[in-house]
């Protein structure tokens, strides 16, 4: 999958959400992809042994970390964009123990609706300016630039949405869900998956 994105060059894209990145072989592969022009966006809550924005190595790698109210364990692996996107969910981190010493299973997402939902979740995670931190080339973390933006906590967003639905009557739930999905679909049509490309470019300018 990484090789497929490398073959696309600057049109390639990899987005991964996991707890840790420590496997040297895959880190080297990410570096190879970065050198080929592939945009790599990582959302890694804990240990991350790849340094972003190192000239000639990881110029096209961005590392984010979100540590909020809830201890999340979701793993998402996305390769490519648009109709060519291959999206998986699973339980494996990018660690040697997962890659070499365990039998891990990743589930491909075929449903367009579920794929869109997961893409929106990733997009909103990257818009978090309360708990998200961005790794610097020296390995330290800094808050993203949120000047002129309202505070946005992705975990609180999904929590408040779930609470709102749970308090609604059955018919109201359906109505709200339709309005909610219509709004999201409109955003998807407007932003498509080019959001990640625009997000990456904005972040690189800072």
Model-assigned labels for residue ranges:
Residues 1-206:
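PLD/PLD-like phosphodiesterase catalytic module centered on the HKD motif
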């Amino acid at each position: 999958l990484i090789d497929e994105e490398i073959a696309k060059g600057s049109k390639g894209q990899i987005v991964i959400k996991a707890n840790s990145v420590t496997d040297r072989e895959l880190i080297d592969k990410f570096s190879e992809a970065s050198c080929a022009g592939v945009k790599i966006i990582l959302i890694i809550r804990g240990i991350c042994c790849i340094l972003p924005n190192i000239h000639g190595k990881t110029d096209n790698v961005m590392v984010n970390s979100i540590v909020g109210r809830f201890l999340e364990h979701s793993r998402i692996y996305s390769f490519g964009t648009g109709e060519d996107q291959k999206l998986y969910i699973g339980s494996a981190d990018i660690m040697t123990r997962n890659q070499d010493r365990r039998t891990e299973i990743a589930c491909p997402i075929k449903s367009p609706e579920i794929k869109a939902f997961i893409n929106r979740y990733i997009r909103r995670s990257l818009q978090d300016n309360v708990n998200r931190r961005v790794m610097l080339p020296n390995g330290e973390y800094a808050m993203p630039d949120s000047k002129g933006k309202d505070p946005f906590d992705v975990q609180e967003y999904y929590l408040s949405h779930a609470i709102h639905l749970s308090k609604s009557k059955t018919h109201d739930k359906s109505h709200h869900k339709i309005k909610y999905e219509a709004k999201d679909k409109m955003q998807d049509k407007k932003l498509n998956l080019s959001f990640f490309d625009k997000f990456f470019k904005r972040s690189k300018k800072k």
